[in-house]
Amino acid sequence: MATCWQALWAYRSYLIVLCLPIFLLPLPLIVQTKEAYCAYSIILMALLWCTEALPLAVTALFPIILFPLMGIMEASKVCLEYFKDTNILFVGGLMVAIAVEHWNLHKRIALGVLLIIGVRPALLLLGFMLVTAFLSMWISNTATTAMMLPIGYAVLEQLQGSQKDVEEGNSNPSFELQEASPQKEETKLDNGQAVSVSSEPRAQKTKEHHRFSQGLSLCICYSASIGGIATLTGTTPNLVLQGQVNSIFPENSNVVNFASWFGFAFPTMVILLLLAWLWLQVLFLGVNFRKNFGFGEGEEERKQAAFQVIKTQHRLLGPMSFAEKAVTFLFVLLVVLWFTREPGFFPGWGDTAFANKKGQSMVSDGTVAIFISLIMFIIPSKIPGLTEDPKKPGKLKAPPAILTWKTVNDKMPWNILILLGGGFALAKGSEESGLSKWLGDKLTPLQHVPPSATVLILSLLVAIFTECTSNVATTTLFLPILASMAQAICLHPLYVMLPCTLAASLAFMLPVATPPNAIVFSFGGLKVSDMARAGFLLNIIGVLTITLSINSWSIPIFKLDTFPTWAYSNTSQCLLNPPNSTVPGH
């Protein structure tokens, strides 16, 4: 019997893929409408995304097969959804991020900020969180976590070594950093945790160090997820939202762009980051704030040890190269162009220099990202000069460009590009089949629920759902439904879509919830219960912070207090009874 269950478990992915479509067949066979056919496709894809029986990107290709066969959309129209302006923004933004990562500019920024902030326990946590969050705004959460963790563990090793030396009356002879792999770090952590000590003070110190290492690990992975919400390109769900809004509401006049998103999400990120720092400090360092800020016994030696580790790593980077300076300049230029293209509170360069006959900008954030990334393929990584090829003496060799296609091809997550397209295809299929309207009609009773309560409940639901499945899949499934619901109850669509998009990044409780959590967990020293305990309250804090932001400073940015004309549908009751306000208190 045991062997039978083991065989079923081993082949579970194959069984799910084969049985799931058959199990769901009664829906399209009994209810033979386009709405039912589209619902069948969405439910099938949702379950495959949740179980990951197939790779996420492979499941995202299903609409190309199912929609034409079921008469929902023509194949040519479905395929157009897989490469839209949002996908271009994703590719361009990631190419710039790859250049930053390739030339180690992110590491220089991280170490420089840590040297400025200092290494007292509480400030060390804050420093790592600020740096990780800032980097995660521009490069992938996974890459940021993978880079910051080895730095954090090197500092922790030196802190532990310094503490032992202080207790034994020795000096710490060397602060030279020893690079170690995650496996080696895990072994050291495990050994440090299991070692038997002869005195209670030493055991207490070992326990304190272990708690501090847990806190630092969680600070890094949590701040990577939090930092990603601040910019439109910071994490993929943000781009999913922009793409869904542009697809479902084509007349929205580019309401979600880099500048408007930053004005909404950056303050939210800062507040959530500071609250997360306070919570993790209390949970892992205790409430002895005098000691946490480095005024306890022996803290000066520990501080010097940690500072020396960071200083050594920073020195090993050497002076900034020409490539780093060029990438820095282009990166700053990219951000400036993004902010000034269509800022909203004054005419941007996109509205004035590149406007069509209607006065609308003909360029997008994706145009800017591709422009900057193309420049990186042109500028050489060294100052042009006469240098010989070391392999062929006497033959001149030109330096490679700042960005090469090999580097991009190796580091670009092409699967996410397909996943984005699959989400846009689902949204378009829901609209074409009439499923969106059907769902909206069924959700009209929600108009009797206060809007702020609706946002709170939906954000909690998404935050729970994203713990079990990909945040991209979560937003892809929820956003079209939320858009239909908002139209049905005459609520500004962004009032529910924005908070639920941010809630999809609140994956704090489980190692499998998001790659940064998995990376931290694989380093060792953490149990699932540790992450769940820290992440549970942080999820609650996150949802409350998002609810605060959507009911305060977000209202003037997106004009959430009125139902927009671009959200009207032909059958909407809002045409007959236009609401004066969609937000409580306005």
Curated annotation (Swiss-Prot):
Residues 165-175 have a biased composition (Polar residues). Li(+) decreases succinate transport in the presence of Na(+), by competing at one of the three cation binding sites. Highly expressed in kidney and small intestine. Not detectable in brain, heart, stomach and skeletal muscle. Coiled coil: none annotated. GO terms for biological process: alpha-ketoglutarate transport; cellular response to lithium ion; fumarate transport; succinate transmembrane transport. Keywords: Cell membrane, Ion transport, Membrane, Sodium, Sodium transport, Symport, Transmembrane, Transmembrane helix, Transport. It is a multi-pass membrane protein. It catalyses: succinate(out) + 3 Na(+)(out) = succinate(in) + 3 Na(+)(in); fumarate(out) + 3 Na(+)(out) = fumarate(in) + 3 Na(+)(in); 2-oxoglutarate(out) + 3 Na(+)(out) = 2-oxoglutarate(in) + 3 Na(+)(in). Disruption phenotype: Deficient mice display increased urinary excretion of citrate, alpha-ketoglutarate, fumarate, and malate and a modest increase in succinate. Despite the increased excretion, there is no significant change in plasma citrate concentration. No other phenotypic change is identified in these mice. Transporter deficiency do not affect renal function under normal physiological conditions, nor to response to renal injury. Low-affinity sodium-dicarboxylate cotransporter, that mediates the entry of citric acid cycle intermediates, such as succinate, citrate, fumarate and alpha-ketoglutarate (2-oxoglutarate) into the small intestine and renal proximal tubule. Can transport citrate in a Na(+)-dependent manner, recognizing the divalent form of citrate rather than the trivalent form which is normally found in blood. Transports the dicarboxylate into the cell with a probable stoichiometry of 3 Na(+) for 1 divalent dicarboxylate, rendering the process electrogenic. Has a critical role in renal dicarboxylate transport. Belongs to the SLC13A/DASS transporter (TC 2.A.47) family. NADC subfamily. This is Solute carrier family 13 member 2.
